[in-house]
């Protein structure tokens, strides 16, 4: 070589090693003017072209280098890498094997074969080749790195962790390995360790957007949601076109109640990737939480359209259908979810709930059993299994399973006091003090108070009955009660009793069955003086009908169980009927000024407690109520009562019957299909007209 050409080559190499590729390329091309077939210069230009993404040009240059000197292993290795980039794996492997044939201990080329196999999804073969590379060079970190990636792809997470850790032990500068190791550890739920490795990644490479995103995932799993949000935002600032980071940010924002921001992040993720199924699913979750069921349904359907193999999407869609009382469609989609993912306990549980709503208790119980088999301590499944057993009339098994409610996070079953006393299981405890406390709703207390008189003869205990203020006067006449006390979240009565039992556990403790339910009525008694006063106030002709159209608005099933006053108003037009409202609370304001032809008076606003309501009911000829405490009260008083039930009734009303084993004077009117109050009121109007004509005779 001439001196000036040699200097050009040295200068080009210096620029190339320093990463100044444009200057290096310019100098290499000057050399080519003097030596157009120099294989090393052609190869170097090929490497630069590959780095710039000019893959076809890179292939031409390296092939020219090989043509000039086919005995250089490095040239074949580089060609193999280029061909892999071109999507020609077989040709790439052939080139790389040629490099190894020229240099049998060429570990770098061997790992490149593994990477080509990895890119083609041939992970098992790639692992074998990595092991070949390690035979050639036992301390080759890149071989452990590649093998770790393949093990991870095969789901062999423990082995992947070991391989990645060996790579880092050999070469702590492999930033990508810190990131990938963090991902695997997160998938193993080892989030503390994952976060530690991912922090190393972002410390070593602050502009590594993917590592910031993955650190956010680990931090969110550890409950550090605010820090996770900052990580996602950093990833997005570094790489705005990063749909996964926008998606993860949406999930974190949603968990913090930042729904508007979460929706915006979902939309951004979808803009960047229009077929991003998980982003549509996340958007659906946020919209559903905001009450936009229609929007949520559209999103879930788009998620399924983009990826129809995700059980979670069908499960979420089914939840919306169930909330809309479209139970057959809910069942259909829950079934798709469990077919796609048989080990999905929540989907089996949700399917069971939908089947229960359809009245298919046997299939529902089988699905609860499947959910419990997958997750043995699944308290919600056990508790709802109890409701299905009770709904079908299997009280013995139902009461036993009903004990699981204590393990369910339900405010309705949480007693305000923290007990340091044992629960009574039906044993003899003569001379000891037994606290019987109420739980759930007023109607539950009224229904189950019938069992209290059986306690003292069985236990020999001093019976202390604790209940809520609206029931105190009503329960004063209950036999077998030594002390009646008012429940209070401020009072801690641990020193006042020796054992305790929930009023809802009495059927279980006492072994009650469908045949042994105490059904003598009345078992509650109104105030005689108040009854007389109401009778005088309501004296006159016509059938006096007390009505209740809505329960507590915060009740979980209020949308289905309550109706509107206007639906009752048609009954006021029946000749000889006089309607009286027994309604308290905000729903009482639904009543407009009634027209003269449909006289109506709401009496409920004057009730101070349920004794007032009971005394008023005693002056009524009939009570018509949706499923509320007032229906139970009328039944407990032995008053004629018609109870209006949603298509999917509460367990206590059972199925396929128009009477109640709990209340002999009660008649049940059931919706023939979900939310069909029209049919119910048509039937009631017909029956009420018959009753009116009979009373006139």
Which functions belong to the PLM regions below?
Residues 1-622, 627-697:
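Alpha-helical solenoid repeat scaffolds of the TPR/TPR-like class and their adjacent stem/linker regions
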């Amino acid at each position: 070589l001439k001196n000036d050409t040699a200097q050009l080559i040295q200068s080009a190499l210096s620029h190339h090693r320093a990463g100044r590729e444009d200057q290096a390329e310019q100098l290499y091309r000057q050399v080519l003017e003097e030596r157009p077939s120099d294989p090393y210069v052609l190869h170097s230009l090929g490497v630069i072209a590959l780095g710039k993404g000019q893959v076809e040009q890179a292939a031409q240059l390296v092939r020219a280098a090989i043509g000039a000197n086919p005995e250089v292993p490095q040239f074949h290795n580089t060609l193999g890498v280029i061909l892999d980039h071109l999507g020609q794996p077989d040709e790439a492997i052939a080139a790389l094997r040629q490099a190894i044939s020229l240099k049998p201990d060429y570990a770098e080329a061997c790992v490149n074969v593994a990477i080509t196999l990895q890119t083609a999804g041939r992970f098992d073969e790639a692992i074998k080749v990595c092991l070949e590379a390690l035979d050639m060079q036992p301390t080759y970190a890149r071989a452990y790195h590649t093998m770790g990636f393949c093990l991870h792809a095969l789901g062999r997470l423990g082995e992947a962790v070991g391989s990645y850790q060996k790579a880092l032990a050999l070469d702590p500068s492999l930033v990508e390995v810190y990131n990938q190791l963090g991902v695997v550890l997160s998938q193993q739920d080892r989030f503390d360790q994952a976060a530690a490795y991912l922090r190393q990644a972002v410390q070593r490479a602050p502009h590594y957007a993917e590592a910031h995103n993955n650190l956010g995932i680990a931090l969110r799993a550890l409950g550090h949601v605010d820090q996770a949000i900052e990580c996602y935002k950093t990833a997005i600032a570094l790489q705005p076109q990063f749909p996964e980071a926008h998606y993860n940010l949406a999930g974190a924002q949603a968990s913090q109640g930042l729904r508007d921001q979460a929706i915006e992040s979902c939309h951004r993720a979808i803009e960047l990737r229009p077929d991003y199924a998980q982003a549509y699913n996340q958007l659906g979750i946020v919209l559903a939480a905001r009450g936009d069921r229609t929007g949520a349904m559209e999103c879930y359907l788009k998620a399924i359209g983009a990826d129809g193999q995700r059980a979670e999407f069908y499960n979420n869609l089914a939840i919306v259908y169930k909330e809309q009382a479209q139970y057959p469609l809910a069942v259909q989609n829950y079934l798709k979810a469990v077919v796609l993912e048989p080990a999905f306990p929540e989907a089996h549980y949700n399917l069971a709930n939908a089947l229960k709503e359809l009245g298919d208790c046997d299939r529902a119980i089988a699905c609860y059993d499947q959910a419990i088999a997958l997750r043995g301590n699944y308290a919600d499944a056990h508790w709802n299994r109890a409701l299905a057993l009770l709904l079908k009339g299997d009280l013995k098994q139902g009461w036993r399973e009903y004990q699981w409610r204590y393990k369910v996070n339900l405010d309705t079953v949480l007693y305000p006091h923290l007990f340091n006393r044992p629960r009574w299981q039906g044993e003899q405890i003569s001379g000891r003090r037994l606290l019987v406390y109420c739980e759930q709703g007023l109607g539950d207390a009224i229904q189950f108070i019938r069992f209290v008189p059986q306690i003292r003869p069985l236990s020999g205990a001093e019976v202390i009955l604790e209940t809520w203020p609206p029931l105190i006067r009503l329960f004063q006449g209950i036999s077998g009660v030594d002390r009646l006390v008012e429940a209070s979240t401020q009072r801690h009565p641990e020193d006042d009793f020796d054992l305790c039992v929930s009023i809802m556990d009495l059927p279980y403790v006492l072994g009650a069955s469908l045949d042994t339910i105490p059904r003598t009525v009345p078992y509650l008694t109104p105030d005689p003086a108040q009854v007389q006063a109401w009778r005088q106030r309501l004296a006159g002709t016509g059938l006096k009908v007390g009505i209740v159209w809505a329960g507590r608005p915060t009740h979980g099933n209020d949308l289905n169980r309550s109706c509107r006053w206007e639906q009752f108003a048609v009954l006021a037009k029946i000749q000889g009927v006089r309607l009286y409202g027994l309604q308290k609370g905000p729903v009482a304001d639904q009543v407009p000024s009634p027209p003269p032809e449909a006289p109506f008076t709401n009496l409920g606003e004057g009730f101070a407690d349920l004794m007032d309501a009971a005394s008023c009911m005693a002056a009524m000829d009939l009570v018509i109520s949706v499923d509320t405490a007032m229906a139970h009260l009328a039944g407990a008083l032995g008053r004629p009562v018609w109870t209006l039930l949603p298509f999917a009734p509460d367990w206590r009303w059972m199925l396929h019957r128009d009477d109640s084993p709990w209340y002999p004077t009660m008649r049940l009117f059931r919706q023939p299909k979900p939310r069909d109050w029209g049919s119910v009121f048509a039937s009631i109007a017909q029956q009420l007209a018959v009753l009116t004509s009979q009373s006139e005779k």
